[in-house]
Regions:
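Bacterial N-terminal signal peptides that target proteins for export
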Residues: 2-13
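Bacterial N-terminal signal peptides
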Residues: 12-23
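Acidic, low-complexity, intrinsically disordered peripheral segments
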Residues: 26-78, 166, 337-340, 350-380, ...
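Regulatory alphaC helix of protein kinase catalytic domains
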Residues: 90-123
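Small/polar, glycine/serine/threonine/aspartate-rich low-complexity segments that form flexible
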Residues: 108-112, 160-236, 370-381, 412-417, ...
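A glycine-/polar-enriched beta->alpha junction
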Residues: 126-132, 139-154, 191-218, 224, ...
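Amphipathic alpha-helical coiled-coil segments
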Residues: 134, 138-148, 272-299, 306, ...
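Hydrophobic, small-residue-rich alpha-helical packing segments that form membrane-like cores
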Residues: 230-243, 247-337, 350, 355
Length: 623
């Protein structure tokens, strides 16, 4: 929520390109040949240069892929059997067969919690430590803006001074023997007033000075009258630069830079949030992959155990000990693969727990997360040109680059003003009053009995050669040119990221069908081998049993490849949303930047409810 008075600052993070056209800069030639028109064109054409070769009129297309599995020409009844028995997504899960999960690090059977993708992302947005850290950035920058604006607040000042002077003086001379006299003076001075810095670069002050004096003089020294007396001075003073330092462009430069820093912090928060949500989604799909691969390895091991027993039974017929040992080695290798798969499952679970930071199952707990969502296999509609335009409109890096151009332009304006000589104006008017008592002195001011004081002055200063100011101006101009190049590079990197993401989505979608066809072919080969094994005597020869081992390995590899292709497709969709800056919209996340007060209230609320929330979540989701 935006603080009062700065709603427009947080209402929208996107920065209009037109805001920076007058301040843009490019670098295509010598500084002396660079014109403002070319600088504006350099910024305006940064996107058009990247997409001008593309056909913008082409409509978005739905992803397509060849039906490679149809080329296998497998009968429908056999295909149904394959899908029922050899589909890695239909194997018994870790919840149904808890023993395949192995032991946790404490040596106990793991306790499981089923987690969906939506819950994982919501927990990440609400609790992830990286997001919490980034959330503080805008609040810190907001305080910096307030501090910069406070430079133009009214300042109240008040001084009080007491002085007691005993000063020896020369004697009057006409009295023999009286060579010196002594003056005694006591004064109390009080000065009170207000002053304020102006956005034009000047300063205005209004002050009231009261001086109470009591003069005592020995011997024949004259004593003033009235004594003691009170003088009053009401003064108004304006100090205003006329050349260097003049104008709101210079006076408000620090405020504008602070506001841009706040916008940059908001863009950084959005970037961190997009990255963290994408990492969480990727970690969830990694968990799905590890979960399915664990089931694949377990199924492969169970098939291998059956073949090993068949080979052992052939010892009385045609098997030799070496063949039995080879079968045992194959099974033991698969047991090792199962241990590695269990470790991968634990690692993927812990990684997702770290990103979620859910108090119900912290990273240190031995609760194992079990994914409840399956990876999608549906085509999406894509248009490269529209994806690029969307990315340029939504990527926070583009906003940051535009803000850098504005910052450089502000600094260049200040440096250009610094080329001028210093010519300052001082105008002062005073109302004076004096009497024995202070109230009478103020009455004299009201009656205008004393002549008022007016001061008008000019102060001029100019460095010989002015090399320092010229060097700084040249530096700021070069920095502005660099900022435009950085903006163009940000656009280029964004376009490159979108193209790579679109390429990954299309390629991985096609790879799903290729991997599925490979898995179906491997499953058909193993199914045929098992049918021959049951119907003929040749199926139980040692050679055919070893061939069955090989077909099992081929099927497991094909199953893992299919799972990997499907997971990579879902991960590519998440990466595409990240590349286009639409991750938050895609996941229905409202991007609202909290202010410092909201953050403090939330932290107090979390500290009071963390313990209760953790125990409730674990009891409700445990398996």
């Amino acid at each position: 929520m935006a603080p009062a008075g700065r709603g427009s600052l947080r209402a929208g993070l996107g920065v209009s390109l037109a805001l920076f056209l007058s301040a843009g800069a490019g670098c295509r030639g010598p500084i002396s040949a660079e014109s403002e028109v070319s600088l504006r064109d350099s910024v305006r054409r940064a996107l058009e240069m990247e997409i001008e070769k593309l056909d913008a009129s082409r409509e978005a297309q739905k992803l397509q892929r060849a039906a490679a599995s149809e080329d296998l020409e497998i009968k429908p009844e056999y295909l149904a059997e394959i899908e029922a028995s050899y589909d890695p997504f239909n194997y018994p899960s870790g919840v149904e067969k808890r023993e395949i999960l192995g032991e946790d690090l404490m040596g106990d059977p793991p306790k499981t919690v089923t987690v969906g993708l939506r819950h994982a992302i919501r927990s990440c947005v609400e609790r992830n430590l990286t997001v919490q850290d980034a959330t503080l950035g805008p609040a810190i920058s907001e305080a910096s803006v307030t501090a910069a604006e406070s430079a133009f607040d009214w300042v109240f000042f008040s001084d009080l001074t007491w002085t007691d002077l005993d000063t020896p003086q020369a004697g009057p001379g006409f009295i023999p023997g009286l060579n010196e006299v002594q003056d005694s003076l006591q004064t109390v001075t009080s000065s009170t007033g207000f002053r304020r810095s102006l956005v034009t670069g000047g300063q205005f002050s209004a002050s009231n000075e009261i001086v109470y004096s009591d003069v005592r003089q020995t011997s024949f020294g004259a004593v003033p009258s009235p004594n003691p007396g009170t003088s009053v001075d009401i003064s108004f003073q304006l100090d205003q630069p006329l050349l260097r330092g003049f104008g709101s462009d210079v006076g408000l430069a620090s405020v504008r830079l602070s506001r841009n820093a706040e916008r940059a912090a908001i863009a950084s928060l959005k970037s961190d949030l997009i990255t963290t949500v994408t990492e969480t989604e990727s970690a969830y799909w990694d968990l799905v992959r590890a979960y399915r691969e664990l089931s694949i390895v377990q199924a492969q091991l169970e098939r291998g155990l059956g073949v090993r027993e068949d080979i052992k039974a052939r010892l009385v017929l045609d098997a030799v000990q070496a063949q039995v040992a080879d079968a045992v080695a194959t099974v033991e290798t698969r047991k090792g693969d199962l241990l590695r798969a269990q470790r991968s499952m634990r690692r993927a679970s812990d990684q997702l727990k770290a990103l979620m930071n859910d108090p119900a199952f912290p990273v240190g707990s031995e609760v194992m997360l079990i994914p409840s969502d399956r990876a999608i296999d549906e085509p999406i509609v894509l248009s490269l040109v529209e994806e690029i335009r969307t990315a340029v409109e939504n990527r926070p890096e583009i906003d940051t680059a535009l803000l850098a151009i504005d910052d450089a332009s502000i600094r260049e304006t200040v440096a250009e003003n610094g080329l001028l000589p210093q010519l300052d104006l001082r105008a002062q008017a005073s109302l004076l009053g004096f009497d024995e008592y202070g109230d009478r002195a103020y009455s004299e001011i009201a009656e205008n009995e004393f002549l008022d004081e007016f001061v008008l002055g000019l102060f001029f200063e100019q460095p010989i050669g002015n090399r320092g100011a010229e060097a700084e101006f040249r530096q700021r101009r070069l920095e502005r040119m660099r900022s435009v190049i950085s903006y163009r590079r940000a656009v280029q990197n964004t376009v490159l990221g979108v193209k790579n993401a679109v390429d990954d989505v299309k390629t991985n979608y096609r790879l799903i069908e290729q991997a599925r066809a490979t898995r179906i072919a491997a499953a058909e080969a193993l199914r045929t081998l098992l049918v021959e094994k049951e119907l003929t005597d040749r199926g139980f020869t040692v050679e055919r049993l070893n061939l069955e081992f090989g077909q099992q390995d081929a099927l497991a590899a094909a199953e893992r490849a299919e799972v990997a292709a499907l997971i990579d497709y879902n991960r590519a969709i998440a990466r595409l949303a990240e590349a286009t800056g639409t991750t938050l919209t895609r996941n229905r996340i409202n991007f609202v930047v909290p202010d410092a007060n909201q953050i403090e209230q939330r932290e107090r609320s979390v500290s009071l409810t963390t313990g209760d929330a953790g125990s409730e979540g674990e009891d409700s989701d445990s398996q």
